[in-house]
Amino acid sequence: MAAWEWLSKPAPLVAPTLLGMVLVRQFADGLQVRAQIVETEAYTAGDPACHAYRRKTRRNQVMFGPPGHLYVYRIYGLYHCLNIVTEAEGIASAVLIRAAQLDCLPEWIPANKRLKPARVAAGPGLLCQALRIDGSHNGWRLEPVAAGQEGIWLEGSPAWEAQFPIVQTTRIGITRGVELPWRWYIKGHPAVSHY
């Protein structure tokens, strides 16, 4: 299977397969922080909760592909959210990475958050803060980079046959499309978001 072939499917098919995979964030100084994905949500063009529900705009154009790129946006004017673009080019579809477990705590994580390391990236805004992902990463391709360069990519295989119990339920933190069961998380994992 080609590197991006499995990401060329609709977000509701891709989202559960990302569970257990590792998102790698490499910084220019060589530091790599790995985050095991523990919670995802799917958004597609026909979904009223999707940013591209009505039409393509400058803000959401990355959602229209190609797959394997990052769609990063700001919510509440404060926090960023990280999505992985899926499906064929021209079709708006993305998976929100809601929560992850970091393999290490970078120096910029405040002392009070270090007391509960599993909670450092337990929500989409917290995840972006922990990995220092912001709007400048919007449109980046998910691909490994050479030492001394910044990059974000995935490691591991898509979890077509999960090795841990997965819960499928409705999405949270939205007001439209709330009935769609397009949220997945690893059951009992301490890094899953609380709301």
Swiss-Prot record:
Keywords attached to this entry: DNA damage, DNA repair, Hydrolase
Taxonomy, superkingdom: Bacteria
GO biological process terms held by the UniProt record: base-excision repair
Keyword Hydrolase in record: yes
Pfam family, one: Pur_DNA_glyco
Disulfide bonds: none
Enzyme class: hydrolase
CDD domains, sorted: AAG (cd00540)
GO molecular function: alkylbase DNA N-glycosylase activity; DNA binding
EC number: 3.2.2.-
Keyword Hydrolase set for record: yes
Family named by the database record: Belongs to the DNA glycosylase MPG family.
Stored HAMAP family: 3MGH
PANTHER family tied to this protein: DNA-3-METHYLADENINE GLYCOSYLASE
Name under which the protein is recorded: Putative 3-methyladenine DNA glycosylase
Organism: Synechococcus sp. (strain JA-3-3Ab) (Cyanobacteria bacterium Yellowstone A-Prime)
